[in-house]
Amino acid sequence: MSPTAFEPVAHTRIPSLGIDFAEYLHPPTGARHFHLACDDPNNAFMVAFPTLPQDSSGVAHILEHTTLCGSERYPVRDPFFMMLRRSLNTYMNAFTSTDTTAYPFATQNRKDFDNLLGVYLDAVFFPCLDPLDFAQEGWRLELAEDGAALEYHGVVYNEMKGAMSAPVAQLWQHLHTALFPDTVYRHNSGGDPLAIPQLSYAALRDFHTRHYHPSNAVFMTYGSFAAAEHQARIEQLALARFKERRAPLISTVQTPFVAPRRLEVGYEADAGEPRNTHIVWAWVHGATANVDELIELHLLGGLLLEHGASPVRHYFETTPLADAPSELSGIDDSAAQLVFMCGVEGSERAHAEALEDGLLEILARVARDGLPRDVVEAALDRLEMAQRDIGGDGYPFGLQLMGRVLAAAMQRRDARALLDLDPVLARLRAALDDPGYVPDLVRRILLDNPHRVRLVMYPEDGKAAHEHELERARLAQMRAEMDAGAIAEVAAASAALAERQAREDDPDVLPRVTLTDVPPPADLLTARERGSATVPCASYECAANGVFRARLACRLPALTPAETAALPLFCEYLTELGCDAEDYLAVQARRAAAGSFQAWALVRPGPADDGALAAWLLLGGKGLARKREAVLATLAEMLAGVRFDEPARLAELLQQSCAEAEQSITERGHQLAILTAAARLTPTAALDALWDGPAAIRALQAATADANEAAVAQLFATFESIRGKLLAAPRELALIGDAATLDGLAPDLAAFAPSAGGVGAEFVIAPPPADEVNAWLASSQVNFCAKAYRAVHESDADE
């Protein structure tokens, strides 16, 4: 292998993650490469650029789309989606955030990695950027069907119309505009639909030239492939063609406020509906790339907001002045500066002052009295578990690690420190010896920090109609000023785009893997059986990085239609209610010290028969290896001990679930349409629609509106009936961890044993009614449509 111009900058072993961290610089161009070496075969790659918007035209977002519409070596219209079918990738994507655009992928196959690397590098450095692709992905003018009016079209234009219909998206954008009024973060990087048509094709090309230069590029790789091999390919495929080194682009920070600010804005909603107002508070404190400030803020967020026993979350959950805590509650580390956010939804404008007084009183109490040391240590343990956990819920671990360091890398700060958290966690544990540490955090970050905004977002009837009228008037004026030649140009451009979209590209222009490139299937983990006849138990030894997992699977028995419909709420609330003699507050605090826990239902069709269901209720828990006994004890009590006698708590949970579901409608519009369209095709599709579709939201609204004493008691009775059936159901236990964690572990299997009663009927799904509606109305600027087709069974032979 020929040597490259990359030079080493730093190298560190990070034991807590089992990786070797190395940083390299490419002096001829200024490009940087971070390599995370380990023996993980799921190798990952990312190239990222600072994309600093100067307006809300969505230029960075539209450029992200347009780069993936063909490049110099791969001049096909849609190489990204074509590669999805020609690749063994475990992940492929591209995304634009507030100040960065990144292109990540992951795969376990060497040839596939090289194929994807070639396509990605050519796309970002040498894209075609055809004007027709800009028209398709960004925006364009088209004549309406009657030819009498103009309309805006475009993928990103329509995408952002839908995205900005979501109240939470509007809330987030208004908040960041208010917090960072003098920086790029005041702009909508995805694109404001009112501003997107102001972007020109020339501005798009200029933005690419300025931002997508190797001097700005950050390359990241992870896994078992060598750094030198990556560098040789990166230099050969891209960097060798650039001779100029520029000063890198870095986002600026906001000058701190000298006094808190307040803002009220309207959003499209029925002003006649009560309690439709969002009220959120946000503070700016510290730099995202400063590991001490980052972890301190996450610690404070965990202490104040993480669960129902956390003081600020408890206040927002129980106040009669609002329905639920805001979805924006938590820490935002997506920009150069950190943001602490909390608030409520389902309130009134008139309640803002009273809610703020209550919030500041809670913070003042914590600043005065502190919090119990065991509560703070539990929050630190959760931070340590987040550092060590390699699970990822299907998201490749290498890309998770890249996400942790991306902000620091783009800011030209110490990326390694954001991976090696053990030193900062040790400093925090030592700081707990000072009883004034947590009170000082609250005062320094929140109470004494004037860089604060209170945002009230209230319902405003007709706001969307007014914006639509502004757009219609603008288009009408443009149409009136057009002569016949200009109109013909619009029609010709539309025809040219339609012709390009209909053209068949040659897929063989793109690389692919063949069966000869696919290695034999990897060996699955071998289970060590250690259970009994009543509770089969299997342990799986793996490199778990100091995290222990346990999962209890209970076979779903036959349920009534009412019980089947209520099962998602049963699962969601199983970890939110009291247990045995403890109320929910005590349980939340105790379990937070042990780890994290969840419950969910899993129903899958048979490989050859849609009606042959594999149906399970799964209880999962994970924690640090030293807390494995507490994880198992909690898992054993979750089903048997849960209390269905806290009506006020259930009413709170219903309100929160309903508020969350209503706010998610426009965000989940495509998914809701797909679920509804597919509901009558298979039994499991019908169940998906019942549990997650529009009908589920309607049922939740009805349950919340009717959450009186009798209705709550009836729901608890349904939960109790489900629990009784599950307690008698067959079950299996699985334990996952490294050898040191599993050796000597002897779970009390009797605590997991089913109750007497034997095996009842199996779970079945009732068919949906024949007159089921398939159209739903929602407050959105765009429509979501879907058509579903029945596919072959999994066991059908390939052709």
What role is predicted for each listed range?
Residues H33-L36, D206-T209, R261-D270, C537-Y540, ...:
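Short, surface-exposed beta-strand/loop micro-motifs that present aromatic residues
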Residues H314, A324-E327, S532-A550, C554-A566, ...:
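Non-catalytic regulatory/linker segments of enzymes
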Residues S2-T4, L52, T66, G70-R73, ...:
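Charge-rich, well-structured scaffold segments of protease-associated domains
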Residues A240-L300, P769-A791:
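Loop-rich catalytic cores of soluble enzymes, especially ATP-dependent carboxylate-amine ligases
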Residues A37-M83, D292-L304, N545-R590, A633-L635, ...:
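Active/ligand-binding-proximal structured segments within catalytic/core domains
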Residues P3-I19, T90-A94, G757-A766, V773-A775:
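Short secondary-structure junctions
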Residues M1-D40, R500-F548:
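N- or domain-start disorder-to-order transition segments that initiate the globular core
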Residues P28-D40, G272-V280, T288-V291, D333-A335, ...:
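Active-site-adjacent "gating/activation" loops or surface patches in catalytic cores
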